[in-house]
């Protein structure tokens, strides 16, 4: 914990799921947490029963489970026009420059095993809502294509039922935003950043 008077967590996507699970298992480790597009569920264009069947089958075959999940693959620079992460052309190009300068930062698509573990982590988050009363701000992207916004809504509903609602009682929706809220256009990004700073200040 260290000598600091106050401790805060700011986490995004899978980092949000991991941070939430951490606080459910180890109480009172921070004074407040702000989450942007936490991965409590994954957008997959197939029925849940089919996804589970495929993932459970893949889990039993090591070569398959460690391979890229369907529809994904090695890292490649996608044209800005088809990206589903940000509307900011400038920030998107900056990220591509980072990857060009440091190829080791490039991360390809998820493996079958990673997808399965991600889904299980989201389920654990929802099951453990009653174990954490840390003040929580959950920020949601309106035009989300990566994580399942329905799970954000469910998480906030469960927290409210457990007696420690999310800030505002529901997710703070950033209108028009894609998944990478803090890499978005300034107009959207500033709404999220201001909300985070104000939230942390209230718990200072």
Predicted feature descriptions by range:
Residues 2-13:
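Alpha/beta-hydrolase fold nucleophile elbow
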Residues 4, 29-30, 168:
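Core-facing hydrophobic residues within beta-strands of well-ordered domains
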Residues 11-16, 141:
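Conserved alpha/beta-hydrolase "nucleophile elbow" surrounding the catalytic nucleophile
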Residues 14, 19-106:
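Alpha/beta-hydrolase-fold enzymes
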Residues 109-128:
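Active-site nucleophile elbow and catalytic-triad environment of alpha/beta-hydrolase enzymes
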Residues 132, 138-140, 144:
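Short beta-strand/loop motif that positions the catalytic acidic residue
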Residues 134, 148-158:
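Short alpha-helix in the alpha/beta-hydrolase fold that links the catalytic acid
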């Amino acid at each position: 914990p260290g000598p600091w008077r106050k401790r805060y967590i700011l986490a995004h996507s899978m980092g949000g799921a991991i941070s939430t699970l951490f606080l459910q298992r180890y109480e009172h480790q921070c004074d407040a947490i702000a989450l942007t597009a936490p991965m409590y569920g994954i957008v997959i264009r197939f029925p849940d029963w089919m996804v589970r069947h495929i993932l459970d089958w893949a889990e039993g075959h090591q070569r398959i489970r460690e391979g890229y999940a369907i529809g994904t693959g090695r890292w490649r620079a996608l044209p800005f026009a088809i990206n589903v992460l940000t509307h900011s052309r400038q920030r998107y190009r900056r990220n591509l420059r980072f990857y060009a300068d440091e190829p080791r930062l490039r991360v390809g698509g998820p493996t079958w095993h990673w997808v399965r573990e991600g889904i299980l982590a989201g389920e654990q988050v929802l099951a453990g809502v009653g174990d954490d009363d840390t003040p929580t701000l959950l920020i949601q992207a309106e035009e989300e294509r990566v994580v399942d916004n329905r799970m954000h809504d469910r998480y906030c509903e469960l927290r409210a039922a457990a007696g420690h609602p999310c800030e505002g009682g529901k997710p703070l929706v950033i209108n028009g935003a894609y998944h990478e809220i803090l890499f978005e256009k300034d107009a959207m990004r500033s709404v999220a950043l201001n909300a985070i700073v104000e939230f942390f200040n209230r718990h200072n």
